[in-house]
Structure formats: structure tokens, C-alpha cells
From Swiss-Prot:
This is Dihydroorotate dehydrogenase B (NAD(+)), electron transfer subunit. It comes from Lactococcus lactis subsp. cremoris (strain MG1363). One of its GO terms (cellular component) is cytoplasm. GO terms for biological process: 'de novo' UMP biosynthetic process. Gene3D superfamilies: Dihydroorotate dehydrogenase, electron transfer subunit, Nucleotide-binding domain of ferredoxin-NADP reductase (FNR) module, Translation factors. Belongs to the PyrK family. The keyword Iron applies. Pathway: Pyrimidine metabolism; UMP biosynthesis via de novo pathway; orotate from (S)-dihydroorotate (NAD(+) route): step 1/1. Coiled coil: none annotated. InterPro entries: Cyt_c3_hydrogenase_gsu (IPR012165), Dihydroorotate_DH_ele_sf (IPR037117), Dihydroorotate_DH_Fe-S-bd (IPR019480), Dihydroorotate_DHASE_ETsu (IPR023455), FAD-bd_FR_type (IPR017927), FNR_nucleotide-bd (IPR039261), OxRdtase_FAD/NAD-bd (IPR001433), PyrK_electron_transfer (IPR050353). GO terms for molecular function: 2 iron, 2 sulfur cluster binding; electron transfer activity; flavin adenine dinucleotide binding; metal ion binding; oxidoreductase activity.
Amino acid sequence: MSQLQEMMTVVSQREVAYNIFEMVLKGTLVDEMDLPGQFLHLAVPNGAMLLRRPISISSWDKRAKTCTILYRIGDETTGTYKLSKLESGAKVDVMGPLGNGFPVAEVTSTDKILIIGGGIGVPPLYELAKQLEKTGCQMTILLGFASENVKILENEFSNLKNVTLKIATDDGSYGTKGHVGMLMNEIDFEVDALYTCGAPAMLKAVAKKYDQLERLYISMESRMACGIGACYACVEHDKEDESHALKVCEDGPVFLGKQLSL
């Protein structure tokens, strides 16, 4: 696992949905980004808070040495709110890329891939889909949001080749009315590999339905402190060994479904 650190430069920042910001960062850390699903650990500006903020990498451009992160902000007291006030040219203390990402090397052009994302768990799935596009596989992507005003990355996913995209919103303001699990129940083909990231309830539903799938990859969301596996603040139960704890920041955030007790 890489533990590199750099003062990265903010290239741009904008609000892309209600309380959801997109920040583009530039720096040499981008050279280390190879696996989709890893995350960055950002220090809050001006030393305002001790703990860094873990934010997944949504995409990267190695030629430009830039990467993009999307994150949801809290109220004015939160670190994410303070990060959202950074303007172009600002410097950010960044560690990463950290954690284990989504494996893509085994995917072939004949595979039928299912990608399921919910809310702010959607961003890391975009770089995953970009990498899978290169294999020529068929991707069905199911995204769920609370409402249309927090919908993100629809155009980006739609512009990829070999993609069938379906969206659900809890309130019915866009796409299918209901949670993303309703879209999952419409899947009528044999899934070769499944990648998912989102809220615990959604992940539990996915894991239950596809518990026999060998290539089920689940990205866990968790509160983190150190981000490098030292503090044990972000543990999950190991389904294969009850005496062992899995650290989301180091062993994950991406796990095989059979490893987790959800």
C-alpha cells in the first residue's frame, strides 16, 4: 500500500449537486493511481481539525497529472465544508492513494458486469467503469439517489461504451421511483462480476442477493481516523474468521463479498 504525501494544487472546484462538490487536484501522486476504488486522505485547511478526511478517487488523468474527487459537505463546522471553500491555486495536504481498490485484471470482453452504486458511494465507480470499458465487457450500471437534486455523474457514465445505465430516486423525482434494489430485481442475466459501493443497507441487500457470486466486490464506507491501519477505528467483522477484524482503510475499502458479515 502506498503511503505517499504531497501538497497538491486545487485546479478547480464546483458544486455539482446539492451539497456535493467536485474538486480537481493536480500533483505527482496521480502517478501512483492504478486501482479504482482507492481513496485520498485530505488535511482540513489551516490545521482547523486534527483528523484528515477520507475521500474516494472518482477519476484521474495521468497525462495531466490530475484527479477528481466528489464529496458531500456538512454544516459550517465540518471539515468537508472547509474543504469546499478552497479556490483554484490553493494547496492541500494529501496522503494517498490509500487502501485496496477494485480488481479489474481478470475481466474479459465476454464478461457481463453489474455495477451498483448509491448516493455518495457512486464516485469511485466511475473510474472503475472507465477501466472496465477498455476490456470491451458489457456493463449494466444501477445508480440510486435520494432525489434528482443529488444525482451525480449520469452523463459521465452514459458516455462510456457498452453501458446500460438505470437510475432510481427514492422520491421518484428522476428515473424509477424507489431504491436501487428495485432495479437490481430487474436483472435478468447471469452476472459474471459485481462491483458495489453505497450505504450499508444497500450493500447488505446486494450481498444477500448475490451471496453465491465468486466475484462480488464490495466497497465499504466507514469513519476513519489514521487512514493507514494503525488505529483500528474502521473495523468490520471478518466472516471467514470471527477472531479477526478487517480494517476498512488498509484491508479495504474494497472486499470480496465472502469476507464480510453484513
